[in-house]
């Protein structure tokens, strides 16, 4: 039997994303030259939700993109040789813009490092900021998020699961013990 604890329900996730949207607007003094980019897979859906909230608050269209970091990961040798690049979908021009990278969970920092490499290969943003739904600690690289939905100190033997309605039927963040 797996011992699983719910950390955030649908309402808590909604509130966290609304707060992050307000923080992004405040920190950047609006949304001019702002691009929101989600890291595949769940980061994409979180980015889309953030854009919806920001557009509702500011009444301005905000470009949103998708970043596939498959071939930028430093653990690629552990992946199947059949790994297929799904492709990034970025706005035409990221050079000179403020890019908000969005991911579901920040853990070691390796996913974000790969995302930074992938993003910079597509242009030279003026600034890159990081927004995550959950920061669980245990960094292996000097990476710190600018916007956090929930700080969740964990043991390395725990797994944080983020489920989003777009891919998992329901919105929930839970933690479970690694077997």
UniProtKB/Swiss-Prot annotation:
Catalytic activity: UMP + diphosphate = 5-phospho-alpha-D-ribose 1-diphosphate + uracil
Cysteine disulfide links: none
HAMAP family listed in its UniProt record: PyrR
Gene Ontology molecular function terms on file: RNA binding; uracil phosphoribosyltransferase activity
Assembly information from the UniProt record: Homodimer and homohexamer; in equilibrium.
Gene Ontology biological-process entries: DNA-templated transcription termination
Domain of life: Bacteria
Pfam family, any one: Pribosyltran
Known role: Regulates transcriptional attenuation of the pyrimidine nucleotide (pyr) operon by binding in a uridine-dependent manner to specific sites on pyr mRNA. This disrupts an antiterminator hairpin in the RNA and favors formation of a downstream transcription terminator, leading to a reduced expression of downstream genes. Also displays a weak uracil phosphoribosyltransferase activity which is not physiologically significant.
Enzyme class name: transferase
Motif PRPP-binding boundaries: 99-111
Keyword set, alphabetical order: Glycosyltransferase, RNA-binding, Transcription, Transcription regulation, Transcription termination, Transferase
Coiled coil: none
Protein's organism: Brevibacillus brevis (strain 47 / JCM 6285 / NBRC 100599)
Family, as annotated: Belongs to the purine/pyrimidine phosphoribosyltransferase family. PyrR subfamily.
EC number: 2.4.2.9
Protein name (Swiss-Prot/TrEMBL): Bifunctional protein PyrR
């Amino acid at each position: 039997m797996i011992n699983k604890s719910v950390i955030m329900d649908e309402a808590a996730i909604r509130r966290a994303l609304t707060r992050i949207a307000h923080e992004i607007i405040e920190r950047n003094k609006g949304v001019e030259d702002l691009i929101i980019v989600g890291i595949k897979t769940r980061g994409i859906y979180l980015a889309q939700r953030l854009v919806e909230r920001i557009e509702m608050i500011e009444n301005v269209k905000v470009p949103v993109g998708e970043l596939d970091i498959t071939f930028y990961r430093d653990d690629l040798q552990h992946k199947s040789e059949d790994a297929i690049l799904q492709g990034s979908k970025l706005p035409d021009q990221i050079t000179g813009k403020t890019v908000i990278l969005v991911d579901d969970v920040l853990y070691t920092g390796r996913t974000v490092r790969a995302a930074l490499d992938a993003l910079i290969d597509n242009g030279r943003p003026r600034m890159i900021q990081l927004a995550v739904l959950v920061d669980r600690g245990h960094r292996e690289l000097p990476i710190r998020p600018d916007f956090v939905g929930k700080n969740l100190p964990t043991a390395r033997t725990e797994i944080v699961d983020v489920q989003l309605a777009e891919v998992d039927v329901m919105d929930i963040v839970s933690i479970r013990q690694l077997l």
